């Protein structure tokens, strides 16, 4: 039997199916049984995120030269689907860390920035964060008012964010 994605339209390669099964087992066996405890305590699941890093999930779509897995976004989507079956917030931690944190550095950062940040972001040692939503502007990127300026060698950020995905952890970069 050929395995297909959840849409049932694209046959999975052997590599994609292996990844899907691995993440499915991880989500079922290691995330689902304990995630409720984190919610009750109001705690961030550092051990789950560390394991996701060791599994290479944060590095799925990035080249090996930066500590990535050399995979593709389809692999990331498969991993996100399986994680979300167990807990959507764990899936969002991965999604935001990769797509909103590390990918802009990979696509638009300097070589120095890639070398400095991507190995830590791909390993899960550090998490990329993203802040868009502002009071009065919601999540409309065109309505943001926060600014950043370089002053005496330091960045000064002036503004307020309502939500910052992946913020408030000891590993947020």
What are these regions (language model features)?
Residues 154, 158-173:
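A short core secondary-structure module
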Residues 65, 133-137, 162-163:
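Short, solvent-exposed loop/turn elements at beta->coil junctions and helix N-caps
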Residues 124-132:
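A short, Trp-centered hydrophobic/proline-enriched beta-strand micro-motif
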Residues 54-125, 165-171:
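Internal helix-loop-helix
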């Amino acid at each position: 039997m050929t395995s297909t994605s959840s849409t049932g339209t694209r046959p999975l390669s052997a590599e994609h199916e292996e990844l899907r099964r691995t993440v499915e087992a991880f989500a079922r066996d290691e995330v689902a049984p304990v995630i409720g405890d984190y919610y009750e305590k109001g705690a961030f699941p550092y051990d789950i995120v560390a394991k996701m890093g060791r599994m290479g999930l944060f590095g799925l779509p990035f080249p090996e030269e930066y500590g990535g897995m050399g995979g593709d976004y389809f692999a990331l989507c498969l991993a996100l689907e399986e994680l979300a079956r167990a807990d959507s917030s764990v899936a969002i931690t991965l999604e935001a860390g990769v797509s909103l944190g590390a990918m802009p550095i990979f696509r638009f950062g300097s070589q120095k920035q890639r070398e400095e940040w991507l190995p830590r972001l791909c390993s899960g040692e550090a998490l990329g964060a993203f802040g868009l939503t502002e009071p009065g502007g919601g999540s409309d990127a065109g309505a943001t008012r926060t600014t950043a300026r370089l002053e005496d060698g330091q960045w000064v950020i002036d503004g307020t964010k309502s939500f910052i995905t992946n913020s408030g952890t000891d590993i947020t970069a």
